[in-house]
Curated annotation (Swiss-Prot):
InterPro entries per UniProt: Znf_C2H2_sf, Znf_C2H2_type
UniProt source species: Caenorhabditis elegans
Residues annotated as signal peptide: none
Alphabetized UniProt keyword annotations: Metal-binding, Repeat, Transcription, Transcription regulation, Zinc, Zinc-finger
Domain of life the protein comes from: Eukaryota
A Gene Ontology biological process term: asymmetric stem cell division
Composition-biased stretches (Low complexity): 95-105, 131-145, 174-187, 286-296
Domain notes: Third 'degenerate' zinc-finger domain essential for function.
Protein name per the record: Zinc finger protein ztf-6
Region annotation Disordered: where it falls in the sequence: 92-160, 174-198, 282-307, 328-351, 461-480
């Protein structure tokens, strides 16, 4: 008996036992007189009858085992409570154990004796002995099952009797005792035998259900996975053996995990490279000290800046990786924004007019026609609401070239300025149009122009006579 016991193994062993018993019965019927006389002084017919009853009992055990399997699989109903689930059959365990105890107590008592009748005494004795053997075999099986159930409660392991040899030995011992004793036992009624058989099967079912639950709990405890410490093991092995670690990331890692593992790998390689270099320097210094005994000066210590260099390099690697990620993110976002702006400002397709003389605005509801495609693009910006703002003032324009003309005002503010209101313009045409739209500014500008022209003419008139009068005086002075 062991933890690997199953109902299938029990049924196989019982079938083998039945086959062996049938062979023994056939052999004893053919030439069983001498064999029985050598082994036991009992009658051969009694032994054959006993074996027949034993075989029948074993066959009934096999059938009950099959019935138990059907009940466990949910194919049959319990004879007591009518349940088809294994968990519900465990409720019958208490009643089964108590009744099994009474059955075992009855089997320990001596059966009542009957006096053999004069006529047909041998035949009656054989029947009585066979019935007593059958009842004792069933009681022995029930007692063995009862003990196994008690062991199962204490040890929490399934203890179903798979070694059929033990059961057969117990039955044969009972038959030997009955053959040696010339007493006969009273046979029980079939109803009592069926009740005993049902109790035995209930106890077996209760033990199997309890052990199956314990097996499930143990399997759940054993199936708890351990944490993955492959990277830590590799690091420890490399640090102890002085080897360069090789980090092998999992196949299903994310991109961030892969980048972190790459940085960690580079750091470990740099660290162990510096460590190996320091070890090589120390080994070289020790060999030089061993070879030259005349030099009493100790070897110089290892360079303490090696570890600092490795840490600085590691920090630079981390900074580069972080800056690279940030720059990549910024450039990608800027490129995406520029592309989106370009897509918004430029129509996908500029259709031509019906006669093919120009280009039509693709915006719904706008039927303007332009001669050039660039004009359509500049006009399309007005529909999407995009504006170009001046960085020096609050002016904003729908077209870029208008902003460029506006920025000339900030470069030369007095180039084209209205004298009436002080407004600056980038072109002379703009100033002229402003004067035409504003008559007051036109009058002020005309008056100012008249005054300036008058002043210039007066200055010229005054400067002319003075120059003419000065020349003769000079001549007069210069004359002899």
């Amino acid at each position: 008996m062991g933890p690997d016991t199953t109902s299938e193994r029990v049924s196989e062993d019982l079938m083998q036992a039945v086959t062996c018993l049938k062979r023994v019965m056939v052999g004893m019927k053919s030439n069983g007189t001498d064999y029985v006389q050598e082994q036991t002084p009992s009658n051969s017919t009694t032994v054959i009858c006993t074996l027949v009853k034993i075989t029948g009992a074993l066959e009934r055990c096999i059938e009950s085992n099959k019935a138990m399997n059907d009940v466990l699989n949910g194919k049959m109903k319990c004879t007591t409570c009518g349940a088809t689930s294994v968990g519900l059959l465990s409720d019958c365990h208490d009643s089964a154990t108590s009744t099994t105890t009474t059955v075992s107590h009855r089997s320990s008592e001596e059966p009542p004796r009957r006096k053999p009748s004069a006529a047909g005494g041998d035949h009656d004795d054989e029947e009585l002995e066979c019935s007593s053997i059958e009842s004792r075999s069933i009681r022995s099986v029930s007692s063995s099952v009862h003990t196994s159930a008690e062991d199962d409660e204490t040890n929490q392991t399934m203890m179903v009797p798979t070694d059929v040899a033990d059961v057969i030995n117990a039955i044969v011992a009972g038959t030997n005792g009955s053959s040696n004793s010339n007493t006969t036992s009273s046979s029980k009624s079939p109803q009592e035998e069926e009740e005993e058989h049902d109790l035995v099967m209930k106890s077996i079912l209760s033990t199997t259900t309890s052990t199956s639950n314990t097996k499930l709990e143990l399997s759940e405890k054993l199936e708890n996975p351990l944490q993955d410490t492959a990277l830590l093991d590799q690091f420890l092995q490399a640090s102890l053996l002085g080897q360069t670690p090789t980090v092998t990331p999992a196949s299903e890692e994310n991109e961030e995990d892969k980048e972190q593992n790459a940085v960690l790998t580079s750091f470990l390689q740099i660290l162990f490279a510096n460590q190996q270099a320091g070890n090589a320097i120390l080994d070289a210094g020790s060999s030089e000290n061993d070879g030259s005994t005349s030099s009493s000066q100790p070897s110089p210590p290892a360079d303490p800046t090696a570890s600092l260099d490795s840490l600085a390099m590691f920090e630079s690697l981390l900074a580069e990786s972080m800056n690279g990620n940030v720059l990549d993110a910024n450039t990608s976002s800027a490129d995406q924004k520029a592309a989106a702006r370009k897509r918004k400002s430029t129509p996908m397709k500029v259709p031509k007019s019906e006669n093919g003389a120009g280009y039509i605005c693709p915006m719904d509801g706008c039927n303007k026609v332009f001669k050039e495609k660039g004009s359509v693009h500049r006009h399309f910006v007005t529909h999407i609401g995009m504006r170009f703002n001046c960085d020096k003032c609050k002016a904003s324009y729908t077209q870029k070239h208008a902003l460029m003309l506006h920025q000339k005002i900030h470069a030369n503010p007095d180039a084209y300025q209205c004298r009436g209101c002080g407004t600056n313009y980038t072109t002379q045409n703009g100033l002229r149009l402003h004067r035409q739209r504003n008559p007051a500014c036109m009058e002020v500008s005309n008056a100012l122009e008249f005054n300036t022209s008058l002043n210039t003419s007066i200055s010229e008139a005054l400067s002319g006579p003075l120059s003419k009068n000065s020349s003769p005086t000079k001549q007069m002075v210069s004359a002899p």
